[in-house]
Swiss-Prot record:
CDD domains: Ubl_MoaD_like (cd17040)
The name this protein goes by in its record: Uncharacterized protein AF_0022
InterPro entries named in the record: Beta-grasp_dom_sf (IPR012675), Mopterin_synth/thiamin_S_b (IPR016155), ThiS/MoaD-like (IPR003749)
Pfam families: ThiS (PF02597)
Gene3D superfamilies, per database record: 3.10.20.30
Amino acid sequence: MKVKVTLSAVQFRSLVDYESRSFHLDLGEGSTLGDAVRAVEEMLSAEIEPLLERGNVRIMMNNSLVDYQKEKNRVLNDGDALIFITPISGG
């Protein structure tokens, strides 16, 4: 199964060049959101899960914000899109 990943979070700028920030992951059937995060961690040689757990990086899945702590065991489907973003606040 293929899942599209886009790394838009500021934290990834030093790890991947602009042209490489969007790519497809090949994952086995039944893979979860947590499996995808671990695959990206392995690919980048970086720890992403702690950033997600602290809320420094968030994931949008198919244009909806995901609570990683609650949904890391969510099973992915072929064609799902994951965007890693930096949360923005202000007023």
